[in-house]
Amino acid sequence: MIRSRMLALLVVLAAQMVALPALSRDGPADASAALCIKAAKEASRETGVPFDVLVALTLTETGRTRNGQLEPWPWALNEGGKSNWFADRDQALTYLSDAVAAGTSNIDVGCFQLNYRWHGAAFADLQAMMDPKANAIYAARLMRRLAGDSEDWLLAAGAYHSSTPDVAARYLARFDPIYAALGGGQVT
């Protein structure tokens, strides 16, 4: 029931979407952006979560268009719905450290936008949470757990963002076209 509702919403929303910027499985030319792709590849090897699923996830979470290409960004933070893309790791860590010291816990971190409130305790410190490889491996393990034995990556991607069906469906309306543009077709 939930799956059929999500798929119906995806069809409607996908029909309304404008063309996506160019995407590349090989990753962006920018060295920082390439860190998320490299981390996704390593996490895929370690966990068995399909590489294209992880690339689509990082692009959905942190993707921004630069030079006509959608690229992920490892130094991205989202605090209470406000996205910030910092130029480098040090700037992002300074902002993150200050926000956490001020009592903010609803902040999404790094390539896969792991929420500090829900996942921060899994990391030794904020630097580890921001690290592209550690961020990717944690996200991939979470996706593996959410997909379960069914390996339903569509449902896992929706649940990765939210367990609320309508919120997950809106997220999937962005995720699925990105995945398809990578050459993966629709996730099943």
Description of each model-found segment:
Residues M1-L10:
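Bacterial N-terminal signal peptides that target proteins for export
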Residues L23-T188:
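Catalytic glycan-binding domains that act on GlcNAc-containing polysaccharides
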